[in-house]
UniProtKB/Swiss-Prot annotation:
Protein's name in the database: Phosphatidylserine decarboxylase proenzyme
PTM info: Is synthesized initially as an inactive proenzyme. Formation of the active enzyme involves a self-maturation process in which the active site pyruvoyl group is generated from an internal serine residue via an autocatalytic post-translational modification. Two non-identical subunits are generated from the proenzyme in this reaction, and the pyruvate is formed at the N-terminus of the alpha chain, which is derived from the carboxyl end of the proenzyme.
Reaction(s) catalysed by this chain's protein: a 1,2-diacyl-sn-glycero-3-phospho-L-serine + H(+) = a 1,2-diacyl-sn-glycero-3-phosphoethanolamine + CO2
Function in brief: Catalyzes the formation of phosphatidylethanolamine (PtdEtn) from phosphatidylserine (PtdSer).
Oligomer and partners: Heterodimer of a large membrane-associated beta subunit and a small pyruvoyl-containing alpha subunit.
Lineage: Bacteria, Pseudomonadati, Chlorobiota, Chlorobiia, Chlorobiales
Lipid bilayer topology: Peripheral membrane protein
GO cellular component, one term: plasma membrane
Active-site annotation: 183 (schiff-base intermediate with substrate)
GO annotation, biological process: phosphatidylethanolamine biosynthetic process
Species assigned in the record: Chlorobaculum parvum (strain DSM 263 / NCIMB 8327)
Listed cofactors: pyruvate
Pathway(s) per entry: Phospholipid metabolism; phosphatidylethanolamine biosynthesis; phosphatidylethanolamine from CDP-diacylglycerol: step 2/2
Superkingdom classification of source: Bacteria
The protein's Enzyme Commission number: 4.1.1.65
Amino acid sequence: MRISPYGAGSVTTTAIFCSLFFVTGFFLPQPGGAALSLAVLLFLFFTLFFYRDPEREIPTEPGAVIAPADGKIVLKQSIDHPVTGDGSTLVSIFMSPFNVHVNRIPISGRVLNLNYVPGKYLMAFDHRSMTDNERMEITLETAAGTIWFCQVSGFVARRIVCDLKPGQEVTTGNLFGMIKLGSRVDIVLPPSVKVSASVGMKTVGGTTILGWIY
């Protein structure tokens, strides 16, 4: 199982402490010691599962815009967005704690702007979280025009990781961060993108195609 680069330190630290407690369990009175060893082993497996980064086959079709996250589409609507303009399409992907947590670039381009916004920690399936919760807003200049997407913290997930920098050139499918313990990713596509995704669709980050430049 490949581990996300954003979790290497946490996995190493967890593995060391779990190893110590696992061995300690054999020297404690039983069955309490065995229960301790089993508990720390399960915790280690959960940590590995949480930080997993499975291989993904990135679509190579010209003009494809891919999902930036694993999850389920819970909202799709036409909006007038200050970055992408009137007639844009908002697609919201809800990430459960059991989904892969890493996030990927939806389409190649250049990072125009990063905007961290502190906020609340409403449940991610509450659509107010888009405007009220802590989030990282990202603007890309692409062949489709300017697109905007956002990592949103949730009630459980309170740690956003984003390693992008303004001016950075990025490629479709590249890792750029993660939202620990899930939450949601919102993406706003300009009118130049024909969005084929629909509410209820399950997405695989880096693989599922949300729409096409036309």
